[in-house]
A protein has these predicted regions:
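Sec/Tat signal peptide C-region and signal peptidase I cleavage site
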Residues: 31-35
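Active-site cradle of extracellular carbohydrate-active enzymes
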Residues: 190-353
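Extended ligand-binding groove/face enriched in aromatic
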Residues: 79-83, 87-90, 94-254, 412-448
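Bacterial N-terminal signal peptides
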Residues: 18-29
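CBM-like carbohydrate-recognition segments
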Residues: 83, 355, 376-517
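Low-complexity, Ser/Thr/Pro/Gly-enriched N-terminal "stalk/linker" regions
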Residues: 36-141, 194-216, 281-301, 487-517
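N-terminal secretory signal peptides that target proteins for export/translocation
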Residues: 1-14
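Structural helix-adjacent loops and short alpha-helical linkers that scaffold large soluble proteins
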Residues: 38-43, 52, 96-116, 166-192, ...
């Protein structure tokens, strides 16, 4: 990723502050779905149960209008802010996944109407690039940075198009091809245009360079050699496009694909998959009960490549004192400056550090896209099935989260800031491209990424998600204090817009169909 795009990826907590227009949502009583450590799942968490019903009630009472009016009409259309697309995915991908699991066709059609309304904002791609793109012309990031203004912000496009492609793929077996304003055909065509534009000789050369790179090749703070979420999202788009094409054999011709263009896509997809494979580190841990041959496999992503990156300068510092303090100038109250209290030079880099757990939430929907479309990807692109992440590898990532990220405290669950298990400060004095001051996240400061990030859909983590559900709904003072300290998005008063958004991100991840994910 470019350094500037990395800066534009604001943490979830900061993005929630921009959800003010969701205040229309109403508070309601939450049923007590008691946490269980194994055994039968609470009936409240089944598809069709009260928790799913509450999610859709929130959606009907304010979520739909928030997307339609705030994200799309105000930010995307009026301001030209394509970060609205980024936030739409962050806030509502878990909702979409629940709608698909529970087979809510009408809800998916409702989401499709919202997504389709963004297609009118596509414009000719900048310069001599082919196809259409969402061009960022306003909003905090693109107004503040001349480097982003009037460009396609690749992060926003890949992330949103992965959401749209998943939605269209799920509907491809229900909506008849050739119908007026066919959402599936529209989305497949837009996916083709974008994938073809991103698949340049320069992009392929950069992928080959990164495939060959090793952590020791990173010499400075540059992100040039990183595996980023943009690559994961592109693979997810390829996966769901394959699902659409497999479900509708005539769709390829309708959206302008032929054998030659499919072969070109395969070459790009192969490189993307090789990069993910090269950056996946799998280890075998001894069985905790000492059983022979029963070791546990854990996996991490991009380990060691991020050790020198600016956001991770304090990753080995686990103290309570803030390394940087943001102070307002008394003479100029609008001016906030960062004052360093503890220099970063005092701390050695964490050698094996990779992604933080907030960005690693992309793995949830990335793996889901792969798993839903394995056969289709082999059928459509002719790729080697072994090039796809295996189910064992996916399980190893879940084991890593369970064994190294979680603090092993079921009564008071917290989660380390980094997927490696490192738990130092994150994003101290981070510049997100808007000139704001950020003191950073202390140890366990990204714990809210677990409930909002979708991790509870992983079978190994579901019971812990149910436990956290109980804690966030508890009226006990000790529980409320714990939530306020570590899960602030769930600590606000019922009816608060930020809390409603957090719950609409979290609760769908707990809902299962027939006891299965």
């Amino acid at each position: 990723m470019s350094k500037h795009n990395a800066r534009a990826r604001r943490p979830l907590a900061r993005a929630l502050l921009r959800a003010g227009s969701l205040a229309v949502l109403l508070a309601c009583t939450v049923p007590a779905a008691q946490a269980q450590s194994g055994g039968v799942m609470p009936a409240a968490l089944e598809c069709g149960g009260p928790v799913e019903g509450l999610v859709w009630r929130r959606w009907d009472e304010g979520g739909f209008v928030f997307v339609q009016q705030q994200l799309i009409a105000e930010r995307l259309v009026k301001q030209g802010d394509t970060y609205a697309l980024y936030h739409l995915e962050v806030f509502f991908h878990n909702l979409l996944a629940m709608a698909q699991r529970c087979q809510r066709s009408a809800r998916q059609a409702q989401l499709a109407g919202l997504v389709a309304s963004t297609y009118a904002q596509l414009a000719p791609a900048p310069g001599d690039q082919p196809g259409r793109a969402w061009i960022c012309r306003g909003g905090p990031e693109c107004s503040h940075s001349i480097r982003l203004r009037n460009t396609e912000v690749l992060l926003n496009s890949t992330q949103f198009l992965a959401f749209a492609s998943s939605l269209a793929n799920g509907m491809s077996r229900e909506v008849r091809t050739g119908a007026p304003n066919d959402f599936v055909e529209q989305t497949a065509r837009i996916a083709r245009e974008h994938l073809e534009r991103w698949n340049t000789p320069a992009a392929q050369d950069a992928l080959r360079k990164r495939i060959a790179a090793r952590p020791e090749d990173v010499k400075n703070t540059s992100s040039e050699l990183f595996l980023t979420d943009k690559e994961l999202w592109q693979i997810a788009i390829y996966a769901d496009l394959a699902g659409m094409l497999a479900a509708r054999p005539r769709l390829a011709q309708a959206v302008g694909l032929n054998d030659g263009s499919i072969a070109t896509m395969k070459a790009h997809l192969d490189l993307l998959l090789r990069l993910v494979a090269a950056r996946t580190t799998v280890q075998a841990l001894p069985d905790p009960e000492g059983k022979t041959g029963k070791g546990i496999r854990v996996a991490d992503l991009d380990a060691g490549f991020w050790r020198l990156y600016d956001t991770n300068r304090y990753a080995s510092y686990t103290g309570r004192d803030k390394p940087v303090v943001c102070k307002r100038d008394p003479a100029r109250p609008e001016l906030v400056t960062a004052q360093t209290q503890i220099p970063a030079e005092r701390f050695a880099p964490v050698a094996n550090i990779g992604w933080d757990i907030s960005h690693a939430r992309r793995l949830v929907h990335f793996f889901d896209a792969i798993e839903r479309n394995r056969a289709a990807m082999v059928q459509v692109y002719g790729i080697d099935p072994a090039s796809l992440p295996s189910q064992d590898t996916m399980a190893a990532f879940a084991s890593q989260f369970s064994l190294r990220v979680w603090n092993q405290d079921r009564a008071r669950p917290l989660f380390a800031n980094y997927f490696s298990g490192a738990n130092g400060w994150y994003r101290v004095n981070y510049d997100n491209g808007t000139g704001s001051c950020a003191e950073g996240y202390p140890p366990y400061g990204l714990s809210e990424s677990f409930p909002t990030g979708g991790y509870a859909t992983w079978p190994a983590m579901h019971a812990l998600g149910v436990r956290l559900y109980d804690i966030t709904q508890s009226s006990r003072k000790e529980d409320r204090d714990f939530v306020a300290a570590h899960y602030p998005g769930f600590a606000r008063q019922p009816g608060d817009s930020g809390r409603m958004l957090a719950e609409m991100m979290f609760w769908p991840t707990l809902v299962r169909r027939g006891g299965a994910r």
